[in-house]
């Protein structure tokens, strides 16, 4: 994996578009480069952009909390939202990275975000990520972030956590890792390798073992309180239950007999009320029939009027049709006269339009020859105008070329003069620095040697200056040790064994209080359950009373509904018989007799001279339909009553089932209450608790639990105080060991510093002997006074002389080019002047020709603007005349057709009116004849009968029919209920009503007592059954719990701990072995002198110094440079672990250089040189000036004011 380019826009302090291209010089050939800049300028933002483009997040954002918010306009963003990196006041931003994937292809990953409407004050939109294959230009992912993450990790070969460990090397974490304790080192290694799973497994094993142990103990306690009855006691309970069941059955049967006798009196009262109700309904029906006498007479007249009602309606319709046809005939006559007048006017206007059309056609034919000549003249004028425009353009271009060439000649002359002056200045400066000519020619060879000499002398001076500080530090190192020893003596004035014994005693007291709390809570739970059961039993008794009353109500309603069903069946039978008689009255033979009746003559059957049904076929049909509907209504009423009876029976069964369920629930609750009482009897409760009422018992237990909780808290506080003292002792021991270690380290550091100074001083003397032949006397004196500044001044002077030589060579070459270009410019200026004169003369000739042709064309066209306008005006006149003729011809033809249609319609209306008049006269004669036969029908009654609607008449007929049927039905019902009452009184019981009520009350009491005895015995048996089932189930469950506890206990012994450190130390030991192996591979390439190995403690580390006889050194004895070197090797080892088999060719180091002394810095630079020698591109982010001077290729982050920065690549 290799990074090729990083691009970004408007991220943090880096404003605008910025780019770092590792494929272009000087970065392409530089294995080591630095990202430099002042603090806060934006160096780390480059790494943020790298992570953003690849993963949409950064390590800095991942370490923040999502709960904290950052304001963004009217909204808020979480602190770990990657969009916080967008620069304030910018509408959009992006981060883009080109890289080489594990398959060798080049890819481009991009992250971008923008604000709504691309405005700086718009709301932030969701960020977007895309991945593109640069080899095939194919977009691999562009919309879904999950798809992008999957594709990127597949192509890159690393996820986010692996990338931050393998590519972004934060070696300062390993500096802390080296000198941490075992626990801290395990936690750091867990964080660095992302293997927190092992701590979680250790905690989970401990928790599961504790849970399994707790469950096992609870089951053992439950089993102790679930012992069943002996076999002899159980047999006695079963015999008692059978006896109570027989007694309860006998009492129930006796109660049913008494309830049957009570039901007779209830039924007698109901039948009396039913008879009175039927007599009242019959009287009301007869009154309603008498009140409708007027309606019955009106219906008889309607039957007599029915045969001529159609004749009357037809006469009225013919009167309206005659009036309407007369009005239509008059309108058609007027329309025909108006149409004739319009027809004559249109014919005159059409003749005039045809004459104007002939004149316009004649004018168009005469103008054809002049039009052709005018078109030819216009075509020639357009050609001359194009020629004139082309010559004007040529004239303008020649003027422009002449002006440009003149300006170019003047600029070349001025440039030539400037270069001649600069040439003279450079030649003078080179003569002044001629003394550096020889050293400058070999500067590349001697620069590294001079830099090494400067560094060694500087390190020697710094080493000499550090010696007094180290001596002083050694003198002060003993003071903390003496102070800590005095604290130890003061702290352990009492016996340590006494502290341990007190801790054990407090733990024992705490355990005892916890057991008492658990026991009291169990008592409280059982008493609370018992109070709840008693409350539920009271509510259940009340509900059972309500259910028994509801059962009696349903039984009474069912009996009443059954009687109504029986009455409805009898009424239906009576209705069917009446309807059968009415149908016989309308049978076929009766219809034949009725058809032979004659108005005014006697009926052969009854002798009446009035025959109301003779002409009332419609009335007979309506009566037949009404009979059918009446039978259907009676059947539907019977069906509804039957359904109601079924519903009442089902409700009775359901209510009885609910009562049985309540009785069963009562038995179960009674059994549970008895079981709780037995459980309380088995416990040894305090005497004062047993003497209290149930409600007071719960209050006593609550107070006792509060007291126990206070005692336990006091024990816990004492225990915590002793634990704190114990921890203080352990802390003091650690501080004593650390003070002793610091004293030893300072002694060793002073010895090593003295040896280092002597070695450096010897190297400085050797460097002086090699350097003297290279410098002149003046430079040698400066060198001895200030080597660093002299070296810098020499480098700047030699670099300046080299640049002056290169610039002088460029100027001489440029002067030759300028001389040649000046000669060419003079010749071109002369040529352009000649071309300009020729273009001006051609333009003047074209203007003269065009003016002469425009004069001829104007005389020919006259008042017309052009030939096209002249032709169009003639054609428009001809077309307008033709359109006028066509416009008049169409309405003339239409008007003629309309006149013909009006004549036909007028003739049809006259014929229709004659037919209507004939029919009206015939019907009028029939109506007069019918009126003469009706003696008692005057005009007022006739108008009233004709004004009566058919709906009203039908309503009266139906009302009369219903009243007649209701009278019949009520008569039948009253007779039936009298018969039912008589039959019921024949079955009167011997006991009177008052004595029967007393017998019922006494029987119910006996039944309740019998049921109570039965339920108590049944509850005892059920409780014993539950105990038997529970004991068997608990034994099986306890065995499973013990097996589960043994399994988790073994696992807890191996890896379990409450803090998770047990398995973490085991797992991180393996990780540490693997990390040491990978780090030693890196050390062999960076510095073969050192090698890491485990030792000193469980997770301890030692350094093997091969140049000191494989001496084992403590990590506390390493110098700053050695610590950096070991930390870098550990970071590279972790990167190798994270990347597995993937080769990482790009590394970024962001920490750890600011605290290094010059010698350590030199050692670090040597390690970095070895690192880049492995073929990797290494980027170092630091603001240390010494590193900037030693790394020539840099990416500089430059501040530009107003919080903005930019990137610049130098080298």
From Swiss-Prot:
Signal peptide: none annotated. SbcCD cleaves DNA hairpin structures. These structures can inhibit DNA replication and are intermediates in certain DNA recombination reactions. The complex acts as a 3'->5' double strand exonuclease that can open hairpins. It also has a 5' single-strand endonuclease activity. This is Nuclease SbcCD subunit C. Residues 115-156, 197-407, 497-584, 628-1048 form a coiled coil. One of its GO terms (biological process) is double-strand break repair. Heterodimer of SbcC and SbcD. GO terms for molecular function: ATP binding; ATP hydrolysis activity; DNA exonuclease activity; endonuclease activity. Belongs to the SMC family. SbcC subfamily. InterPro entries: P-loop_NTPase (IPR027417), Rad50/SbcC_AAA (IPR038729). One of its GO terms (cellular component) is DNA repair complex. ATP binds at residues 37-44. Keywords: ATP-binding, Coiled coil, DNA recombination, DNA replication, Endonuclease, Exonuclease, Hydrolase, Nuclease, Nucleotide-binding. Residues 71-81, 410-419 have a biased composition (Basic and acidic residues). The gene is sbcC. It holds the Pfam family SbcC_Walker_B. It comes from the Bacteria. Residues 62-81, 392-419 are annotated as: Disordered. It comes from Pseudomonas aeruginosa (strain ATCC 15692 / DSM 22644 / CIP 104116 / JCM 14847 / LMG 12228 / 1C / PRS 101 / PAO1).
